[in-house]
Amino acid sequence: MAKEKFDRSKTHANIGTIGHVDHGKTTLTAAIATVLSKKMGGTAKSYADIDNAPEEKERGITINTSHVEYETETRHYAHVDCPGHADYVKNMITGAAQMDGGILVVSAADGPMPQTREHILLSRQVGVPYLVVFMNKCDMVDDEELLELVEMEIRDLLSEYDFPGDDIPVIKGSALKALEGEPEWEEKIVELMDAVDSYIPTPERQTDKPFMMPVEDVFSITGRGTVATGRVERGQVKVGDVVEIIGIAEEAKSTTVTGVEMFRKLLDYAEAGDNIGALLRGVAREEIQRGQVLAKPGSITPHTNFKAEVYVLSKEEGGRHTPFFSNYRPQFYFRTTDVTGICNLPEGVEMVMPGDNIEMTVELIAPIALEEGTKFSIREGGRTVGAGVVASIQK
């Protein structure tokens, strides 16, 4: 069977369904795929297809996720849905599926529940920038006032976590009825996707962001200078660009890129995804090392203290067998290197058990190029015991 060609004319966005268990996330995912395939052509997905989520390994953590794709008139979407609550937490923290926006599913019959709150908080912490709300199971509630109350409750909850609760689109529908093909409820799915199309902005492409490349290796070429190799994480770099070497050292160092090579060939420029060697002017071999990053000046800064949202691996996932306490000192693995850090648990939290997720503050012994949303692993003796994401920078 010939593979379908990927249509690049439409903008691409990554979204996912979030919300409390049994509020209808997977049914909604199936309904969107089915309704849009009727409207746009393409393949429908059944509930069973999506619910049997394959296990994936992301940085040693086992996560069950389903990936579904569909398109609207203007966009192509990759949609991620997770069967279990723990899978969501892991998915969002590891960034296994980076989301440009999310659809928060809330059952109109139950209103917001504990996981609704937790998923909104996680979205805030890990940087899911935009949410649209789908109030599900509205066919089961015939009291208009009750629906309005639930909507107000959801909006208040979103505002509590710094989302614009008053402006977020809230669509009332029934995923199950839409999946069963009832036209009035199918219309609500179309309305939902119109809201997603218009409310969730087109994500900035990796190549349009400011240049950054984590340094993987460094070597000197006699007579030419020092070369740093690595994979460009974002943006573009051209010969003649000024870049900063950031991290580990107290001060960032500025230098000019005098050559860009890929597969032993010279290039004019390189962009996100390319594995390159960058020749740096006036940089001694010992002035740059693995773990630092090359970046557009001023675009990212070195830090030691931050708040993080962390998932601690369970024993079954190969994590710790025992809890840890405040002042725990593991290695924090950022991009290409380990740095020792000190964990401080929030007030009133005495210890963290394997399998938990927790917000903690971390102090690294050396500065690293960090920003909100930077992902890291926590390691002990080379094995991964946790995964986290920088929620806010403190110093």
UniProtKB/Swiss-Prot annotation:
Gene3D superfamilies (UniProt xref): P-loop containing nucleotide triphosphate hydrolases, Translation factors
PROSITE patterns cross-referenced by the UniProt entry: G_TR_1, G_TR_2
Chain intervals for the UniProt region annotation (G2): 60-64
GO function terms (MF aspect): GTP binding; GTPase activity; translation elongation factor activity
Top-level taxon: Bacteria
GO cellular component terms, A-Z: cytosol
Region feature (G3): 81-84
Coiled coil: none
Broadest EC class assigned to this enzyme: hydrolase
Residues annotated to bind Mg(2+): 26
CDD domains, A to Z: EF_Tu, EFTU_II, EFTU_III
Enzymatic reactions: GTP + H2O = GDP + phosphate + H(+)
The keyword Ion transport is annotated on this UniProt entry: no
InterPro entries attached to this UniProt entry: EF-Tu_GTP-bd, EF-Tu_GTPase, EFTu-like_2, EFTU_2, G_TR_CS, P-loop_NTPase, Small_GTP-bd, T_Tr_GTP-bd_dom
Region of interest (G5), ranges: 174-176
The name this protein goes by in its record: Elongation factor Tu
Organism: Lysinibacillus sphaericus (strain C3-41)
Lineage, highest ranks first: Bacteria, Bacillati, Bacillota, Bacilli, Bacillales
